[in-house]
From Swiss-Prot:
Role, per record: Produces ATP from ADP in the presence of a proton gradient across the membrane. The catalytic sites are hosted primarily by the beta subunits.
Species in which this protein is naturally found: Chamaerops humilis (Mediterranean fan palm)
Enzyme class: translocase
Gene3D superfamilies: 2.40.10.170, Bovine Mitochondrial F1-atpase, Atp Synthase Beta Chain, Chain D, domain 3 (1.10.1140.10), P-loop containing nucleotide triphosphate hydrolases (3.40.50.300)
Complex formation: F-type ATPases have 2 components, CF(1) - the catalytic core - and CF(0) - the membrane proton channel. CF(1) has five subunits: alpha(3), beta(3), gamma(1), delta(1), epsilon(1). CF(0) has four main subunits: a(1), b(1), b'(1) and c(9-12).
Protein name per its UniProtKB record: ATP synthase subunit beta, chloroplastic
Domain of life: Eukaryota
GO biological process: proton motive force-driven mitochondrial ATP synthesis
Length: 498
């Protein structure tokens, strides 16, 4: 039985004797349970249904109380399939919310919404557990300092820097490199910040969850030989799960991240893929509970639900949780209530471009569409701000000239525009970077580029000092010194060929 690990076993047995209810009604994943007078469970309490099916199959379903209906009835949402449940079955009130394992024992493992390992690697140490429902940190505990979270990825740090303890939206279609970018961030936070990551797979395809796990093992983010040295914990509630599980799996991942922040005092990266599915699951549960739908059929509690998740993702004086959330935009409609509610909480957006991916420029982050509230002179400094603006202006001018180049060719441009195009093409290539996690696929070693080095490199390109170098010298290199070295090698090679 999945008892609440925070309660000792004698208490559980008395709870089982005292607080037993019975199923009165089952509608899909929603159960109505009748309790004796005066023994009603609290909202968000975990209920456990145990028993046997008619064919003798063992049943163990955990539910969460969502509504108190009156007449000693509560309405609960199941966290797993309700097949085989019948009216009259006994329901145990655990007396506390769902609790999940936290701490170092979670690293390198895959969990479901209940905090149970699903990777067939044996049980997890459950001595340290934490309830998934908690209030956000008090205002006095928050760290109000606006500081940049250096990722070591040039295009991100220069043009759309992440805020330490901020929330970032990751926009991109299939096959443009979201997973590789996520894995590189997990790798870099572990190496540069000594931090850990938690990945919450919310309502996405099970194939994607499996692929991510395999790629993490291949790239060393999950260390198979020594699980304790892994840098990430995975929590999955995929498309095949009932809406209750998909709605709560984000909170399970967040609870694990909060422990690393508050107790271990670490910098944590929390990935949520996909935040839209969290809203979608909430909408399904809301309809099942009989609530009147609001705008576009979404739940009336949309803003509150989103807020209760997002407000727990923050920096405190102990550590920080920086969250990167993949955002699916239904029918590409940015005004849809789900993405619109998400945007209100984001500090930065990283947009991946299929055009750049097709050119082979990875990471395929669009330098013009990606934005950040941190890119202000008073936060990043005048030098960083000026360099970023000039890079954007040069890229924008190149974009405007592309139609003319396609029709008339480069020769028809003015001298000034030709120079702008040459520098913009160098910038475009210099924004690419070899990743540590892609080493196994590309064969070229990964590079972590500090912010100072990044700014220096782009200043040299913009100043015209490197106008004589071929543009391919800037492709897939780390800092600017590597680009000049690569240019010399290319020159030597071309002389040898002649």
């Amino acid at each position: 039985m999945r008892t609440n690990p925070t309660t000792s076993s004698p208490v559980v047995s008395t709870l089982e004797e005292k607080n037993l209810g019975r199923i009165a009604q089952i509608i899909g994943p929603v159960l109505d349970v009748v309790f004796p007078p005066g023994k009603m469970p609290n909202i968000y309490n975990a209920l456990v249904v145990k028993g046997r099916e008619t064919v003798g199959q063992q049943i163990n379903v955990t539910c969460e109380v969502q509504q108190l209906l009156g007449n000693n009835r509560v309405r609960a949402v199941a966290m797993s399939a309700t097949d085989g449940l019948m009216r009259g079955m006994e329901v145990i009130d655990t007396g506390a919310p769902l609790s999940v394992p936290v701490g170092g024992a979670t690293l390198g493992r895959i969990f479901n919404v209940l905090g149970e390992p699903v990777d067939n690697l044996g049980p997890v140490d459950t001595r340290t557990t934490s309830p998934i429902h908690r209030s956000a940190p008090a205002f006095i505990q928050l760290d109000t300092k606006l500081s940049i979270f250096e990722t070591g990825i040039k295009v991100v740090d220069l043009l759309a820097p992440y805020r330490r303890g901020g929330k970032i939206g990751l926009f991109g279609g299939a096959g443009v490199g979201k997973t590789v970018l996520i894995m590189e961030l997990i790798n870099n936070i572990a190496k540069a910040h000594g931090g850990v990551s938690v990945f919450g797979g919310v309502g996405e395809r099970t194939r994607e969850g499996n692929d991510l796990y395999m790629e993490m093992k291949e790239s060393g983010v999950i260390n198979e030989k020594n699980i304790a040295e892994s840098k990430v914990a995975l929590v999955y509630g995929q498309m095949n799960e009932p809406p209750g599980a998909r709605m709560r799996v984000g909170l399970t991942a967040l609870t694990m991240a909060e422990y690393f922040r508050d107790v271990n005092e670490q910098d944590v990266l929390l990935f949520i893929d996909n935040i839209f599915r969290f809203v979608q699951a909430g909408s399904e549960v809301s309809a099942l509970l009989g609530r009147m739908p609001s705008a576009v059929g979404y739940q009336p509690t949309l803003s509150t639900e989103m807020g209760s998740l997002q407000e727990r993702i923050t920096s405190t004086k102990e550590g920080s949780i920086t969250s990167i959330q993949a955002v699916y935009v239904p029918a590409d409609d940015l005004t849809d209530p789900a993405p619109a509610t998400t945007f209100a909480h984001l500090d930065a957006t990283t947009v991946l471009s299929r055009v750049l991916a097709a050119k082979g420029i990875y990471p395929a982050v669009d330098p013009l569409d990606s934005t950040s509230t941190m890119l202000q002179p008073r936060i990043v400094g005048e030098e960083h701000y000026e360099t970023a603006q000039r890079v954007k202006q040069t890229s924008q001018r190149y974009k405007e000239l592309q139609d003319i180049i396609a029709i008339l060719g480069l020769d028809e441009l003015s001298e000034e525009d030709r120079l702008t195009v040459a520098r913009a093409r160098k910038i475009e290539r210099f924004l690419s970077q070899p990743f540590f996690v892609a080493e196994v696929f590309t064969g070229s070693p990964g590079k972590y580029v500090g912010l100072g080095e990044t700014i220096r490199g782009f200043q040299l390109i913009l100043s015209g000092e490197l106008d004589g170098l071929p543009e391919q010298a800037f492709y897939l290199v780390g800092n600017i010194d590597e680009a000049t070295a690569k240019a010399m090698n290319l020159e030597v090679e071309s002389k040898l060929k002649k």
